[in-house]
Amino acid sequence: MNTFRKTYVLKLYVAGNTPNSVRALKTLKTILEQEFQGVYALKVIDVLKNPQLAEEDKILATPTLAKVLPPPVRKIIGDLSDREKVLIGLDLLYDEIQDRESELDF
């Protein structure tokens, strides 16, 4: 069995401590803990406190979730409440299916 697992680096861009920001973070943490236990790094960036980071990463709306690693970079803007849409939108669901299939090949 292959014990190596990818580590996912994600950035969540929010605008302050608004209900949408809080909901997006809570939903995302639930998804990540269920699907990627311990194999992810999540950085939350408040664009009101760090507008230069939003500008550098070309963030135009919040909440925005970006998968930075592994490549390619993928972004989801807006509602993060649909687990499957989040995973598919970031190519995370496909990666996990591929990893599980390759583990079964042994």
From Swiss-Prot:
Disulfide bonds: none annotated. SUPFAM superfamilies: Thioredoxin-like (SSF52833). Key component of the KaiABC oscillator complex, which constitutes the main circadian regulator in cyanobacteria. Complex composition changes during the circadian cycle to control KaiC phosphorylation. KaiA stimulates KaiC autophosphorylation, while KaiB sequesters KaiA, leading to KaiC autodephosphorylation. Phospho-Ser-431 KaiC accumulation triggers binding of KaiB to form the KaiB(6):KaiC(6) complex, leading to changes in output regulators CikA and SasA. KaiB switches to a thioredoxin-like fold (KaiB(fs)) when bound to KaiC. A metamorphic protein which reversibly switches between an inactive tetrameric fold and a rare, thioredoxin-like monomeric fold (KaiB(fs)). KaiB(fs) binds phospho-KaiC, KaiA and CikA. KaiA and CikA compete for binding to KaiB(fs), and KaiB(fs) and SasA compete for binding to KaiC, thus the clock oscillator and output signal pathway are tightly coupled. This is Circadian clock oscillator protein KaiB. The gene is kaiB. Belongs to the KaiB family. The keyword Lipid metabolism does not apply. The lineage of its organism: Bacteria, Bacillati, Cyanobacteriota, Cyanophyceae, Oscillatoriophycideae. One of its GO terms (biological process) is circadian rhythm. Has 2 forms, fold switches to a thioredoxin-like fold (KaiB(fs)) when bound to KaiC. Keywords: Biological rhythms. The KaiABC complex composition changes during the circadian cycle to control KaiC phosphorylation. Complexes KaiC(6), KaiA(2-4):KaiC(6), KaiB(6):KaiC(6) and KaiC(6):KaiB(6):KaiA(12) are among the most important forms, many form cooperatively. Undergoes a major conformational rearrangment; in the free state forms homotetramers as a dimer of dimers. When bound to the CI domain of KaiC switches to a monomeric thioredoxin-fold (KaiB(fs)). KaiB(fs) binds CikA, leading it to dephosphorylate phospho-RpaA. It comes from Gloeothece citriformis (strain PCC 7424) (Cyanothece sp. (strain PCC 7424)).
